[in-house]
């Protein structure tokens, strides 16, 4: 045990209990003394980032791989820069703890006009700004620190959403009592009456269903239930698919797996398998505009049984107080009795384009990339042509597919990949980002080189903001960006870059380069030249829907 043991040490021990081995962030004068404890910690490694926004993205990527992450910023200027990333974690149910180093309590109580404040002697403005984007918050004091740390962390882990701790510089040094046991979160027991009512309603529905299908999405992953879903579809012969954020839940080789459902933009076999079913089991789904090609999904309440983290629905009736795991177990048992074989061959590729020769297009790029993916990869695709082009990729077992289509903050992927590679240093990380998106967060490539990471980064260069061009103003200069020499970027961001770079514009050349980088021996950056106006089918459908809604 570290002596003298203090609040800073208690917080670090609790981060370890939650599964974090690293702390991301940017130093500032209000968190420097806490950082001394981080550096001295045998369990937590400090990971400095280029800026607070990137640090928040990196923490998010880390948490999507490890289940939890922590982020450290300084009061005011630092925490506000990170709020965009924290908001994305909140929207997409990612538990990231935001620790803010703050001025000492005495200075706060005196209302001193300190730097990094609004100059009004008030120190709670930014705390209140964080309330809508975190599930639990606390201002730590000498008296409440240990209790509040545990309360915020357990709430985060239960709800799978971010939390916020304001840590005044002097409070971090105050004496604390070490925890006597590890921090654990026991799932709330199901309401037995509600669970029984749900079982009866679901049984009534499934017993008369001639065709049943399963549609899963990202909340299954957030609540650690991928294995339960995989077992379900192995034991019950039914058609199944995911939505974009849930890609990777199912193995592409599993009989009955159709691919990715995205409303009217779905491949025809996927659309028919899901929308043509009498009953669709929607597990952890969120039918957002970007996931459904502008709300074009054709699924009615009467047709669906829906399972969310803490409640479930049959038809129009909601049953509360039922944890997702117990709802899944209930439905799995019922399906074994009532679901008839509705499987289809699992070899539907999702790709309708036959050739991979000549100049690269969106179609030939994704078909070429498909042959490159292998089990165990971590794939991150940025909002735009990257994420929506990846919708038809068929993922083998144990692939983590990370996208952010609900929050949709471009640039997220590059920094999130830094966090993902930090969490999983021995796995192959593949980054798919547009040129416009990469310009927002490219500094973190320097951190990757510093830490000797070896991601494979594909920059899809279509000379600007292609999504915005598709929505409105295709030739307007506000959709243009500065044109960078991408293959020289690693040289600028490291004094001794261990990196290889290529620029490709032909499908054959891309295939050759991918073969060279397959073993990811060093950081690889591949600039992929694509036609300016070429966009994937889902993105085309989505942008038309978005433009129509914007003009309504």
PLM region spans:
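Hydrophobic "anchor" residues on beta-strands that sit immediately upstream
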Residues: 213, 378, 430-431
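Active-site phosphate/pyrophosphate- and oxyanion-stabilizing loops and adjacent acidic/basic residues
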Residues: 36, 60, 128, 230, ...
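Active-site flanking residues adjacent to catalytic metal/cofactor-binding acidic residues
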Residues: 283, 307, 381, 434-435, ...
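Thiamine diphosphate
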Residues: 99, 109-120, 328, 388-552
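N-terminal alpha/beta PP-like core and its mobile active-site loop of ThDP/TPP-dependent enzymes
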Residues: 1-338, 375, 454-457
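Conserved thiamine diphosphate
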Residues: 65, 116-159, 340-354, 471-513
């Amino acid at each position: 045990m570290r002596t003298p043991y203090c609040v800073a040490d208690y917080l670090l021990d609790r981060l370890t209990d939650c599964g974090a081995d690293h702390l991301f962030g940017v130093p500032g004068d209000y968190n420097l003394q806490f950082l001394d404890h981080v550096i001295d910690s045998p369990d937590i490694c400090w990971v400095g980032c280029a800026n607070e926004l990137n640090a928040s993205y990196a923490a998010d990527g880390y948490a999507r791989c490890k289940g939890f992450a922590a982020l450290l910023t300084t009061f005011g200027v630092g925490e506000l820069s990170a709020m965009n990333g924290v908001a994305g974690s909140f929207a997409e149910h990612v538990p990231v703890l935001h620790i803010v180093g703050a001025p000492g309590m005495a200075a706060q109580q005196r209302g001193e006009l300190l730097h990094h404040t609004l100059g009004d002697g008030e120190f709670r403005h930014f705390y209140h700004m964080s309330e809508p984007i975190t599930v639990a918050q606390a201002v730590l004091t000498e008296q409440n620190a240990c209790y509040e740390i545990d309360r915020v962390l357990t709430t985060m882990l239960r709800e799978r959403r971010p939390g916020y701790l304001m840590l005044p510089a002097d409070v971090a040094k105050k004496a604390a009592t070490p925890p006597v046991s590890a921090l654990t979160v026991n799932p709330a027991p199901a309401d037995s009456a509600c669970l029984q009512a749900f079982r009866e309603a679901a049984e009534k529905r499934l017993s008369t269903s001639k065709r049943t299908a399963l549609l899963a999405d990202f909340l299954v992953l957030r609540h650690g239930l991928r294995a339960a879903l995989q077992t379900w579809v192995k034991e019950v012969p039914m058609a199944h698919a995911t939505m974009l954020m849930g890609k990777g839940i199912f193995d592409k080789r599993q009989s009955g797996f159709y691919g990715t459902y995205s409303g009217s933009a779905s491949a025809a076999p996927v659309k028919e398998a899901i929308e043509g079913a009498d009953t669709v089991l929607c597990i952890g789904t969120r039918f957002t505009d970007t996931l459904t090609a502008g709300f074009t999904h054709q699924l009615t309440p009467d047709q669906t049984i829906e399972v969310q983290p803490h409640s479930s629905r049959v038809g129009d009736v909601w049953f509360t107080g039922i944890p997702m795991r117990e709802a899944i177990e209930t439905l799995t048992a019922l399906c074994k009795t009532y679901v008839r074989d509705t499987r289809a061959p699992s070899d539907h590729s999702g790709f309708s384009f036959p050739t991979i020769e000549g100049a690269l297009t969106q179609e030939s790029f994704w078909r070429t990339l498909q042959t490159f993916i292998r089990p165990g990869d971590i794939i991150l695709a940025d909002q735009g042509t990257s994420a929506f082009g990846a919708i038809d990729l068929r993922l083998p077992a144990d692939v983590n597919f990370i996208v952010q289509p609900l929050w949709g903050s471009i640039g997220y992927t590059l920094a999130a990949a830094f966090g993902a590679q930090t969490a999983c240093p021995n796995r192959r990380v593949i980054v798919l980002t547009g040129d416009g998106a990469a310009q927002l967060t490219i500094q973190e490539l320097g951190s990757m080189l510093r830490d000797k990471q070896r991601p494979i980064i594909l920059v899809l260069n279509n000379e600007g903001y292609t999504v915005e061009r598709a929505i409105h103003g295709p030739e307007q200069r506000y959709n243009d960006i500065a044109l960078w020499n991408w293959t020289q970027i690693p040289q600028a961001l490291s004094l001794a870059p261990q990196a290889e770079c290529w620029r490709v514009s032909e499908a054959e050349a891309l295939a050759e380069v991918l073969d060279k980088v397959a073993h990811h021996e060093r950081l690889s950056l591949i600039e992929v030249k694509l036609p300016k106006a070429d966009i994937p089918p889902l993105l085309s459908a989505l942008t038309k829907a978005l433009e129509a809604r914007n003009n309504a």
